[in-house]
């Protein structure tokens, strides 16, 4: 039995070291693929660990935790497949929700019934043309500013329009034409 244990001991050790937890110490985003410095078991430090990310999404994490895989079972060839920081992870989501978030708290949350909720201090869109198609749009803001011309193609249903502080509803022309007729 000891002979068998001696034979399988290296295999067992290799399997145990195949997937590991780690703590992210340093992130280097200067390479084609992001590299990490990780602290693994006890005092083991791994430098230049490649971090793989999902196509179309990229992030630069702060210190956090990682799951690393030893490629080919070699501890000298580690790759990080997941990096996370549970201290800033959004909480309170329900099954099926998905969220893209920043450590400062702003986020885009996709929820049930086709709802997307964007929470942030400032939202900037940079595009040549913006087309918006909706059944209804509501702007709830104490101040709205348009820097260019505004063309209204439909009928304005506002009860009054003001220009330069003058009411269109109650305005009386100097030529004594009278107030606008409703």
From Swiss-Prot:
Query: InterPro entries attached here?
Result: GpV/Gp45, Phage_Mu_Gp45, Phage_Mu_Gp45_N
Where are the residues of the annotated region Disordered? 159-182
**Ranges of Basic and acidic residues compositional bias?**
169-182
Under the heading NCBIfam families, the entry gives: phage_P2_V (TIGR01644)
Q: Which family does it belong to?
A: To phage Mu protein gp45.
* Name of the protein this chain belongs to: Mu-like prophage FluMu protein gp45
Q: Which organism is it from?
A: Haemophilus influenzae (strain ATCC 51907 / DSM 11121 / KW20 / Rd)
